[in-house]
Amino acid sequence: MNTSHLINCRLVPAASALLFLIACSAEKNETPVPSFNGDRAFSYIEKQVSFGPRVPGSDNSVNCQKYLIDFFDSLDATVDTMQFVHVDKITGKPITMVNIIASFTGYDEDNDEKYILAAHYDSRPRAEYDPDSTKRNNWIDGADDGASGVAVLMELGNLLASQRARVDIDMLLLDGEDYGRPGDLDEYFLGAKDFVLRDVKDKYKFALVIDMIGDKDLRIYREEHSNKYSPEFTDRVWKIAAELGETAFVDSVKHAIYDDHLSFMTIKLPAAVIIDFDYRYWHTTHDTPDKCSPESLASVGRVVATLLYRL
């Protein structure tokens, strides 16, 4: 992902206040939210990184794909893959990439709402910000930038398998998000760009992207595009974070970020991203599991889990 420089409560009469309180209570699902296990989520980061850098088209990527498919299969999710070929602009080499979709059906048989939770599982084929200039063409592990978002989705999958939400949830594991070269957006977000071409707009109400949320020093600000184009849903996320006392979520806008959520916006599907863009090890060979923490994963996981079980 890249960054750009683009872009109350009030007093009411007693009767209205009572209705307000009832409405607020009704918004919350009475079913308790299952406990998000940050330690288990962290182990999923370690497992993904153990395959080596998950650069699109590599054996490492294929092995990680199999692991993720088997994982969600074991939860009895409906798992599908979407394969596409990207031709590298510079080398002309065709690269096969694969998106993975794990679908969890809600318990409400009358429900026709479906939501996307998305994260990219690929890691970057270059480390242009590495302090060691001799390593800037190295592939990176992508523990935070890649594996952390997927790890949160995996643990949320455990929760949904043990206790269904009311609505249908599709977990979308995207390939090719971070393939591009600096300064050229054409070869970023390749999995998301392919996905939105597949007549998906009317199938979903909202897409929430989770990216770079494993940092030990976690600080998540509202992202500018999300806040501008999907304010209602963004407000809902930060309201839940405040309610839960998750202080890593900062209630102000800081960055305008190019990430997978913008691809959903191109088809007018409301979307937002949860991301900590102040990660010191971004696009370096130092983006390794020791820079991440179970506590950070759990903070994000609790917020998103609460959101899911209130939809």
How does the language model describe each region?
Residues 21-23:
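C-terminal motif of bacterial Sec signal peptides marking the signal peptidase cleavage site
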Residues 32, 53-107:
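A non-catalytic alpha/beta surface segment that caps or lines the substrate-entry region
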Residues 85-87, 215-311:
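Active-site-adjacent substrate-binding region
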Residues 137-232, 261:
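Acidic/histidine-rich catalytic neighborhood of metal-dependent amide-processing enzymes
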